[in-house]
């Protein structure tokens, strides 16, 4: 981040573009800033893993997909497997259609990524240094108004549920 005119601005472009992602054709190099791959995860089915050192505070990947309305979100949310990310009060991004690979990043109560929404783009940023071979994780923070979803992250700080109490 840097300061401009007294305001803090967020750098949204990648420092470099990830290339040579032959191990995981499901990762879209247009939206990934570092080399990563998809493989089996101890958290849930498949996960996304760093293939190179990722410094703290950097854009790692953009969550992309089809932009859908709340009504369509409710319809698609009835499925057993969904990749829905709420953008704002009206729009949701469905990573199942046109996803960058970020939709496969698993939940953890003590994640190494955090989310930033900048000008309608959902960015996953590194919360700390990430080492090669480490699984990329983010806190999904599902609403407590939704059905409880059991967490399987095994982190020391695990809440037991992916849901968090809304304030």
Place the predicted regions along the sequence by residue:
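C-terminal SET catalytic tail plus cysteine-rich post-SET Zn-binding segment of SAM-dependent SET-domain
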Residues: 2-12, 109-167
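Catalytic cores of histone-lysine modification enzymes
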Residues: 10, 17-115
